[in-house]
Amino acid sequence: MIFESFFQAPQGFLKGAEAGFHMTTHPSSKASEADAHASSVEEMFGGKSVSCPCCGGTFTPSMLQKIMDDAERLSLNQKDFRAIRTGGLGMMIDPHAHMTARTTDDYEAMAAAGVVAVIEPAFWLGQMRTNVGTFIDYFSTITGFERFRAGQFGIRHYCTIGMNPKEANNVALAEEVLAVLPRYLTKEGVVAVGEIGYDEQTPQEDKVFRAQIELAKEFDLPIMIHTPHRDKTRGTQRTMDVLEEHGFDPARCVIDHNNEETVREVLDRGYWCAFTIYPSTKMGNERLAALVQQYGSERVIVDSSCDWGVSDPLAVPKTARLMADKGIAADTIHQVVYKNALAIYGLNGEMQESHWLQPQAIDQRTLYEGNSVLRGQEPKVHTRTVDATVIR
């Protein structure tokens, strides 16, 4: 469904154009049997330039070949994702995905593409919350129902808990939220404090950030950092300075939403360096592939940050696909889309590889507090088989 809508246009154009091209190069409107089985532009069109049936423009053989190549490359869908040999386990983790804002179709597509686990960071919901009760309900959802919902589609769900910087500027509310955080930091499936850090880099954000660094130390949890959209370089440097001022070990901290301006210093200072595939505002997968080629895979992580806005829950699999197409080593791909996320977010033992290598059966007959993910459909009951040799 997701892939189909994305890839339908090039395929449709190719099919329509191909039929039209045959009409311009053959007396009959029906393509010959040989044409139907042609394996190249030269075989199909005899090496001639042809007229486009849509606009009347001219296509050279090389242009036609590119159209065919692009259409073939884009013809993947969630049920037929081409295999990428990895030299290791062929599975992916999306370590930053706001799944409460996504649909069950997204879970199905992610599972089909090889995603075995997601981490959902606590963040804001698109509008400011006004009382602590809304945070309590939200924290209960990402530590409860959302874990159940993901499991109904064969994906393990984990989360991070924290007071996000965007809403931290409400002083009274922030104090109330900070007071309730400890009750959730020991919940099953909580792998870090996050996402925390700076948004507008105000004194109030700084106060809330520092308080949560101390909570992470108290509960012996890693930290997931949100870096600001504006003045990112200064904000990222300030974030690392404050963490180090509090004596927090960089090896236990993921700095997320990096770009070309921040990557070197983040890695040089010993932090885990995560990249969010948001082409317009954060990081495009072409740019990410170039950075992996430049800096390598050590402590580098890829995520989608898919949420309620325009975003892509398949950003991690698509980026893996692109890196493979660019000739990046299979083990390097495996490290940035799977191994590194497991290493840092598995530190407290809540996230373990055995959770998906030895999975519980998917049984959509089960309920969560009386609620089902189904709406009249036949329940699926089976065990998800994880493919340990390819990324799908």
Question: Residues of each region from the PLM?
Answer:
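Short helix-capping segments at alpha-helix termini
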Residues: 151-153, 245-249, 294-296, 325-331
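Short, charged, surface-exposed secondary-structure boundary motifs
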Residues: 128-131, 282-289, 310-312
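Short, acidic/turn-prone active-site loops that include or flank metal/cofactor-
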Residues: 122-126, 277-282, 306-307
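Mid-to-C-terminal alpha-helical segments outside catalytic/metal-binding sites
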Residues: 2, 6, 13, 24-26, ...
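Short acidic/histidine-rich active-site segments
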Residues: 295-313
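Catalytic pocket-lining loop regions of alpha/beta-barrel enzymes
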Residues: 210-294, 298-301
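Mid-domain alpha/beta scaffold segments of enzyme catalytic cores
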Residues: 2, 6-7, 25-30, 39-48, ...
